[in-house]
């Protein structure tokens, strides 16, 4: 009689333990490496990933833009860095030229373009360059559906812009791009500041600086923003599934200690309430890179000054009296009703929803789309139409 074959459960469990031990070792090693400032910066900016490889910045046509529509320019910053940038003509200005125009046509029409058409000042996210195909599609949408010019820069250390990116350095780059537009003859009220992902922190800081200087510009658009780098670390999930900080959060106080090693802040949440212009915050609900809850937090920070506060008794909840619980509940109900009365919600079938309110005399909008992911949300025609109706008049589009 043959002997039955029994599974080697002990061997299987041993292999599983080894796999988890290796994964734990790799995780611990990655966590330790990310406390090193040089490695931390490279992971955050990913500027060494210069996609597309061998980009032809002096020939934008090779990346999908129309012949003679884009000027490849250089912008000098206050700390003597030179930034590569593209200035792309609006369709109205471009279509007034004979086709095909000479290669230098866009450069010759910059002053005319910025005085006759609105301009989108665009700040891209981490990694890659201004020539990335997704970004080029975004420019094309802005120049056609918004009929606006576009100025897109590569920060220091990105693309053909030499240097090393830093939080303060990117802020100087943004201000240099703004100053360049104004020097070409653009009116501040004709400039719409748009940022995507990492670029939302750059756009927010520039917008706050301009607001504090009393400059009235057209507005600010934050596409797929994060509230702060600290919060992003807490909420980031690999492939949208595996929470990066979960093992660390299981150790008391370990997360706080770890985040103390972060050398970058990019804290938009702490400054966004200083903006005094129309604001559009937009996010795709299927964004696996940055959760759309970050946009909720930014929108709530803008709404907070207009809501009644909620006061808690200065003792532990276990010691609250029935009366104190009742008063606390009443405050919550009053706050919820105040929020509902301030907000106007618009549901757009098969697309998403918008919440809007008027703060400090300006319209604040939160747009959530059902699709678009992290990188493509700005290329959606519906998103560009929301930007159009939020910031542009019919006269702007003629």
Give names to the regions the model predicted.
Residues 2-67:
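N-terminal membrane-anchoring alpha-helices
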Residues 78-178:
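Membrane-embedded segments
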Residues 165-168, 179-194:
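Gly/Ser-rich "nucleophile elbow"/oxyanion-hole loop immediately N-terminal to the catalytic nucleophile
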Residues 193-195, 221-223, 282:
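Short beta-strand immediately N-terminal to the catalytic nucleophile in serine-hydrolase-like folds
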Residues 195-199, 203:
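Gly/Ala-rich beta-loop-alpha elbow adjacent to hydrolase catalytic centers
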Residues 205-271, 288:
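Hydrolase active-site cap/lid region
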Residues 274-276, 281-283, 287:
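Short beta-strand/loop motif that positions the catalytic acidic residue
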Residues 289-292, 296, 307-398:
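C-terminal catalytic histidine-bearing segment of alpha/beta-hydrolase fold enzymes
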